[in-house]
Amino acid sequence: MANSSPVYDWFQERLEIQDIADDISSKYVPPHVNIFYCLGGITLVCFLIQFATGFAMTFYYKPTVAEAYSSVQYLMTDVSFGWLIRSVHRWSASMMVLMLILHVFRVYLTGGFKRPRELTWVTGVTMAVITVSFGVTGYSLPWDQVGYWAVKIVSGVPAAIPVVGDFMVELLRGGESVGQSTLTRFYSLHTFVMPWLLAVFMLMHFLMIRKQGISGPL
């Protein structure tokens, strides 16, 4: 590269970053690709917004049944731009689910799930399940009346499963009833377990797309 900087030359010598950039920028894009093929990328952007705003809220949120609601109120009323951070988090969550649904429909209607892209489809469906689980766990964190009863209903659903139903309910709730252990588990799932799971499946998903390319037209 002409007129390159010393910093660029230092990285180029060690990592060959120009070859990486050329490989990314020269990937063939089929002529049938249109704006609807951007829905997956928009979903990723929504996830990144979720991650950033969620991380910011962890500085103020207190995952206890006694202080969860008041900490959310403090974030909304006393923290500078706290209302904006939480509002962006909520709206981007809704947008992420909407974009995900549209993306799934686009892939299905254009046959993007067919051989040899079955595993790409499986990882995508897995991410869809994780995304919905994000909504269920996040809904409970303010620990208001809506959140409490939502957790009570959702965590009680597995009771209908034969043999292991009661065990699954107790596992979700952290005991026989909804309480502090339930909130702690949902907070852990929402802020640590699920983000890592989603990141891993996203990486697998993108690597498969990178390897196999975009599916052709119907």
UniProtKB/Swiss-Prot annotation:
It comes from Synechococcus sp. (strain WH7803). Heme b 2 binds at residues 89, 190. GO terms for cellular component: plasma membrane-derived thylakoid membrane. It is a multi-pass membrane protein. GO terms for molecular function: electron transporter, transferring electrons within cytochrome b6/f complex of photosystem II activity; metal ion binding; oxidoreductase activity. Binds 2 heme b groups non-covalently with two histidine residues as axial ligands. This is Cytochrome b6. Heme 1 (or BH or b566) is high-potential and absorbs at about 566 nm, and heme 2 (or BL or b562) is low-potential and absorbs at about 562 nm. The lineage of its organism: Bacteria, Bacillati, Cyanobacteriota, Cyanophyceae, Synechococcales. Its cofactor is heme b; heme c. The chain crosses the membrane at residues 35-55, 93-113, 119-139, 189-209. InterPro entries: Cyt_b/b6_N, Cyt_B6_PetB, Cytb/b6-like_sf, Cytochrome_b_N_euk/bac, Di-haem_cyt_TM. Belongs to the cytochrome b family. PetB subfamily. It comes from the Bacteria. Pfam families: Cytochrome_B. It is found in: Cellular thylakoid membrane. Keywords: Electron transport, Heme, Iron, Membrane, Metal-binding, Photosynthesis, Thylakoid, Transmembrane, Transmembrane helix, Transport. The gene is petB. GO terms for biological process: photosynthesis; respiratory electron transport chain. The keyword Thylakoid applies. Heme b 1 binds at residues 103, 205. Component of the cytochrome b6-f complex, which mediates electron transfer between photosystem II (PSII) and photosystem I (PSI), cyclic electron flow around PSI, and state transitions. Heme c binds at residue 38. The 4 large subunits of the cytochrome b6-f complex are cytochrome b6, subunit IV (17 kDa polypeptide, PetD), cytochrome f and the Rieske protein, while the 4 small subunits are PetG, PetL, PetM and PetN. The complex functions as a dimer.
